[in-house]
């Protein structure tokens, strides 16, 4: 057994050997007005910014297709409020569901540069943003949600890649040849669950949703694409959670599921409801 373990250790990937760093750019030390500053730009921040910008551009591309639910210039408000929804919703949900101890020192909530965001909370924030834009511009929020859903996997993909670069949110111990030894996770090789999520929530979900958008009449059934997104993300996250190491402070909950899996259940239910009822909302171009 010891010899087998040694041979396996030789075949796995050592994260440190990949030469990855969470810091994208080191801007050096600055001395301004008596203050010493050392600004660093992290890949995680760039992933969020790039994901939002690319999703914005992709929504504008989708809006060029027949039957657009809003004018291109109205996307400016949508992007602003969606970005705010991602930051506020993502951070608050992380604190409430994963790190409630932060509430003992509320100022810690604002330290976004230290990480700690919930994808579920970010989605809720985006849906609230869509509702606000819909209300102020008298639009169909379900149709807007359909278009946002088709673009959202872009941000999910980049975010999961950033998780991998950061060497965080690693998977459970694994004997697979592509297992990775993360320096902060001990000596055991682990599933690169961040990349599993990038593939499922990012690449596959993007391909499926946009096939539905261009090759079927799904966009003529308001809420159907948004429903596909919710179900697709929920199932992807639920599956990958079996390979992902549970959060240390939570572990596996009393009913045998992780917090991530538990939070996907209402998401999948809501998505199924949107899909099933979408036929009643059919529109014509």
From Swiss-Prot:
Its main location: membrane. Coiled coil: none annotated. It is a multi-pass membrane protein. One of its GO terms (molecular function) is phosphatidylglycerol-prolipoprotein diacylglyceryl transferase activity. Keywords: Cell inner membrane, Cell membrane, Membrane, Transferase, Transmembrane, Transmembrane helix. Its EC number is 2.5.1.145. It holds the Pfam family LGT. Pathway: Protein modification; lipoprotein biosynthesis (diacylglyceryl transfer). HAMAP family: Lgt. Belongs to the Lgt family. This is Phosphatidylglycerol--prolipoprotein diacylglyceryl transferase. It comes from Zymomonas mobilis subsp. mobilis (strain ATCC 31821 / ZM4 / CP4).
